[in-house]
Amino acid sequence: MEEKIGVFICTGYGIGEALDVDALCEVATGEFKVPFCKTVKSCEGAALSAMNADIKAEGLTKVVIAGISPRRYSSTAFPPEVMVEMVGLREQVVWCLPPNDEDTQMAAADNLRMYITKIQQRKPLVPFQPEDEVSKDLLVVGGGVAGLTAALEAAKTGYGVKLVEKSDHLGGWLAKQHKSIPTKPPFRDLEDTGIQELVAEVEANPNIRIFTSAFTAETDGAPGLFDVTIASSGNGKPEGEVIEKIRVGAIIQATGWRPADPRPDLPYGDLEDVILNVDLEAMMKADGRITRPSDGKEAKKVAFIQCGGCSGKEKHSYCSSICCMTSLKQALYVREGRDDAKAYIFFEFMRTPGQYEDFYRRAQEDDGVFLTRGLVADVAKNEDGGLTITATDTMLGSEIQVKVDLVVIAAGMIPNAADGEAIRALEDAKVNVLDGDSEAKRVAAAETLEKLGHHDGTQILNLNYRQGPDLPALEYGFPDSHFICFPYESRRTGIYPTGAARQPTDGMGSREDATGAALKAIQCVEMTSRGEAVHPRAGDTSYPDFMMSRCTKCKRCTE
């Protein structure tokens, strides 16, 4: 289409009273030979529709609007094929300088000249389109509540979803729970988890294809062009056997969590009747009874030790946000239908945010639930075959001892996520130990191996990226973006962590989080298909020119 420039000059908002608008029109049509220039009384609302009609009628390809701030317009105010520049005469000239003054008129004319020159030099952006067809299918890694929710929400909007789960069944940790903490008013009574209904809905959706007993063996490519190799995780097939190679547009990592290791001062593993909160949940899920593992007898007195998976600043010093509510829930398990049963909860901090405060009150109102703000100093076997807990009541400053049948440690959440940068450093160190240029380099590599050795074999996504096979991780192993303003974004565009893999959360929080991640993944594939940037310059269609003479082939620009 032949280039044609038009100028609209607004006389409203006090602009016409402060400036000689006809002189500005002369600048456009005289100095710049602009073929179309028109004054308008307003540049919003109905006047905006009239301007768009003029743009279409005159066949304008480039437009300068001299009026109010460009912030007053949305990105869809003008046809996408028309290039538009906006001169803020009101904010930049009229409000800043005296009206009907020579300098004011000169400032307005100079502003108009700058923007006409700018629009003359602008060239239409040609969005980048890859040679291969962009895929709009999504890959969800993880079949827990977050993964199932993300898959279902995306599938409901019409997108194809591939769901990969390493175990032989869907549901994750929520499928192993007896009951769920309340998720709706009045936030007092325990609820069914609802996970089986969610699994059934996912399995029945024709847009979702499920791979169980599988993992992502290799991930190549970029947004819209991720090539993923799905392999068997065992469970009837040879481990590592390739099941299928697929192409997807975006990836949602919903790999969940695992229990934290208990504090070393607690005798977990040494005393049979000291268990984790996940063990008690499995016990209730199996037959609805709470028994002592040591002899199978019914446990009528159960103690809960909060923050049992914390090791101060050395290991797990963050709050997992769900442990307190879980212990309150399990205390109600103990009391359910048993008037003579007692539950003791030892805590330093009781955290029940938001409406969960009502659930806390529900537990407080139960005569058989004893809440003690205290630090547990010792758990030992007693002469009755049970356990004796010695604790310091931090409210009263006194030492107390309680005899119980069973001790439950509230272990926190550790994300099921790999640190891609740490794994890459580990792989590089393995090479340097053998082939280092100097002894000092080999010694440094050996130290890195010792420091990062626990990352070996933790890969999840297996990205073929120079910067590492998984997402970069934050301080405590959660993959995130570091950007408060960009939730769900990771530092690998097109890959979105969600649920407990992204931050400690409960089932209801995981559902909400997964819905957001699904929306971001959909946004990614749609914007990629149009050749637009996804993050952080959302909607930008510009594409870089590479100076190949200075390229070192580090591959960072492509990863």
Regions found by a protein language model. Give the residues of each.
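Residues forming the flavin
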Residues: 1-559
